[in-house]
Amino acid sequence: AAKKRPWKCCDQAVCTRSIPPICRCMDQVFECPSTCKACGPSVGDPSRRVCQDQYV
């Protein structure tokens, strides 16, 4: 079973091949969730935000 993601919406997760995998959510949103510790601008669209936190 997949691990629970720390955010309500994370449709575009990118994970490393390490064991355990380290993942980041690449969803572009207008506002990061309150559980996000490091919210930054999207590279593709600076008006949107991407949570840069990683999770296992």
Swiss-Prot record:
The record marks R17, S18, V43, G44 as: Reactive bond. Pfam families: Bowman-Birk_leg. Keywords: Disulfide bond, Protease inhibitor, Serine protease inhibitor. One of its GO terms (molecular function) is serine-type endopeptidase inhibitor activity. PROSITE patterns: BOWMAN_BIRK. Disulfide bonds join C10-C25, C15-C23, C32-C39, C36-C51. It comes from the Eukaryota. One of its GO terms (cellular component) is extracellular region. Belongs to the Bowman-Birk serine protease inhibitor family. This is Bowman-Birk type proteinase inhibitor I-2B. It comes from Triticum aestivum.
